Amino acid sequence: MASEIFGTAALFWVLIPLGLAGGALLLKLQGD
């Protein structure tokens, strides 16, 4: 169970920054 929590946390730690960076990149591209 602990490994499941760790895996989920790791997934969020990776996905959230990627999502924020991707969103910022899209806004920049649309701005131009």
Curated annotation (Swiss-Prot):
The chain crosses the membrane at residues 9-27. Its main location: membrane. GO terms for biological process: photosynthesis. One of its GO terms (cellular component) is plasma membrane-derived thylakoid membrane. HAMAP family: Cytb6_f_PetM (MF_00396). The 4 large subunits of the cytochrome b6-f complex are cytochrome b6, subunit IV (17 kDa polypeptide, PetD), cytochrome f and the Rieske protein, while the 4 small subunits are PetG, PetL, PetM and PetN. The complex functions as a dimer. It comes from the Bacteria. Belongs to the PetM family. This is Cytochrome b6-f complex subunit 7. InterPro entries: PetM_cyt_b6/f_cplx_su7. GO terms for molecular function: electron transfer activity. It comes from Synechococcus sp. (strain RCC307). Component of the cytochrome b6-f complex, which mediates electron transfer between photosystem II (PSII) and photosystem I (PSI), cyclic electron flow around PSI, and state transitions. Pfam families: PetM (PF08041). Keywords: Electron transport, Membrane, Photosynthesis, Thylakoid, Transmembrane, Transmembrane helix, Transport. It is found in: Cellular thylakoid membrane. The lineage of its organism: Bacteria, Bacillati, Cyanobacteriota, Cyanophyceae, Synechococcales. It is a single-pass membrane protein.
